[in-house]
Amino acid sequence: MISLIIGIMVSLVVTIVGTPLLIKLVHKLNYGQYIRQDGPKSHLVKRGTPTLGGVVINLAVVLGWCSSALYRFLTRGEVPSWSAVLVLFAMLSMGFLGFIDDFAKVRKKQSEGLTVKGKFIGQFILATIYAVLALILPTKSGFPSAQAGMSFIEKPFFSFEFAGRVVAIVLFVIWVNFLMTAWTNAINLTDGLDGLAAGSSMIAFIGYAIIAFWEFYHLKGSDHPGFTYAVSDPLDLTIIAACAAVACFGFLWYNSNPASIFMGDTGSLALGGLFAAMSIATHTEFLAIILGGLFVIETMSDIIQVGYFKMTHKRVFKMAPIHHHFELKGWPEVKVVVRFWMIEMLFVLIALVLFYGDWVARSGL
């Protein structure tokens, strides 16, 4: 518990202290956000707002976990787990890809950075590296960092092992690529209003911190009664999820309306990569659809808008993603953000109830 508190406190201090320093640096370098011309006209005043805020979020999560790991090493002789390193790799690698995208935007002085093809290739390479390492690297607990299958909670309802190990690895790589691409793009789409992505991500990662801690408390081989989980190093996952939630909380102090800084793709892609990796590491890939329900709604609204327009040349929403639809209906930006936070809270609550209900059912209580 002390290691968890240390991680949380370090992450909070890094974001609270580091974000204003980054704002000054970005101002000095003149790295401001460029606003899409087809967006709501009310957003044009945000042009020039410092971006690259995701750098602080990434740094806060890493330093928070490293501080926690150092404490455990000095007091108990515990070495860092590969599971934690892999989850952080997913976050940092996607964050680095987002940083390249953000840097391209400010260099070209426009709202578009990397090409769709370039971003896809980058995500494919990084997700594939993560997938292969997750299956082959050893862990302290003896449980694999990932399962070659699809899970709602814990045990796969569909295993990729049906046709041998090679096929299982190939299918798992495809599955991980889908998850990484889906969640990075989902949180990226959500990052369209001041504080929306940061606040929603904070709520989602609080949910994952609770899930991972419950899996740690009921880890297979423990003395606690009830169903136990064969999850690799869930305490590390708890700490990382908690650090991510706190990092978003600290960043939100400066990102709330009117935002003093944007997280940019450096932040949204990193948070998406971390969310995907947490779902894989905790064996809750399909539960994540509910846990990150707001991100799913944002993504589906964009898909529906594009698909319907291509078929009929008409629009379902005034603008997509759906948060812009409510803006154009006359809702103040702050009202949209707070209500969307409330929706995400409900999704997380539903996911936690389902997770606990599954544990009760499997425990026979």
Swiss-Prot record:
Protein name: Phospho-N-acetylmuramoyl-pentapeptide-transferase
Keyword NADP in record: no
This enzyme's EC code(s): 2.7.8.13
PANTHER family reported in the protein's UniProt record: PHOSPHO-N-ACETYLMURAMOYL-PENTAPEPTIDE-TRANSFERASE, PHOSPHO-N-ACETYLMURAMOYL-PENTAPEPTIDE-TRANSFERASE HOMOLOG
GO MF terms held by the record: metal ion binding; phospho-N-acetylmuramoyl-pentapeptide-transferase activity; UDP-N-acetylmuramoyl-L-alanyl-D-glutamyl-meso-2,6-diaminopimelyl-D-alanyl-D-alanine:undecaprenyl-phosphate transferase activity
Cofactor requirements of the protein: Mg(2+)
Reaction(s) catalysed by this chain's protein: UDP-N-acetyl-alpha-D-muramoyl-L-alanyl-gamma-D-glutamyl-meso-2,6-diaminopimeloyl-D-alanyl-D-alanine + di-trans,octa-cis-undecaprenyl phosphate = di-trans,octa-cis-undecaprenyl diphospho-N-acetyl-alpha-D-muramoyl-L-alanyl-D-glutamyl-meso-2,6-diaminopimeloyl-D-alanyl-D-alanine + UMP
Location relative to the cell: Cell membrane
